[in-house]
Amino acid sequence: VRFGAPGQEKPGVVDAQGAIRDLSAHVKDITGETLAPASIDKLKRIDPASLPLAPAGVRIGAPVGDVRNFIAVGLNYADHAKEAGMQIPKEPILFNKLANTIVGPNDNVMVPKGSTKLDWELEIAFVVNRRARYVSEADAPGYIAGYAICNDVSERNFQIERSGGQWM
């Protein structure tokens, strides 16, 4: 977990009682590298009760900081393709989102000026902890540091009617 003001989040851990504990004396931030197996092994040795408590009611930030790439897969399940009136693609439709659009669970989402068809989808996010290229399906789990819930927000008028597909 990351907590604090936007742009100033600190790394934390949620203890067994649900309290947020401050990990900043041990790691600078929660990043893909922090979530690598060797780093996780070190963090597991820390007794959460020994860590300072975060202030009560503190803002929860995005789960991971220093995101370099946010890659998404369009029409990633048959029901969504059907709902959108589109064919299931033969190959994955990949697109990116800018890292500065990632916000915490209770943060406001910036709505584009002129938006008329704002849409959202609940997605699962995979946090990758190292460089990956041409990874086999069998090896893919070794690159996944963790999972998060993602609320994918899109402006469908801009995406489909104005540009004809994925856009940036």
Per-region residue spans from a language model:
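Glycine-enriched loop-and-adjacent helix/strand subsegments that border the catalytic/binding cleft
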Residues: R68-M168
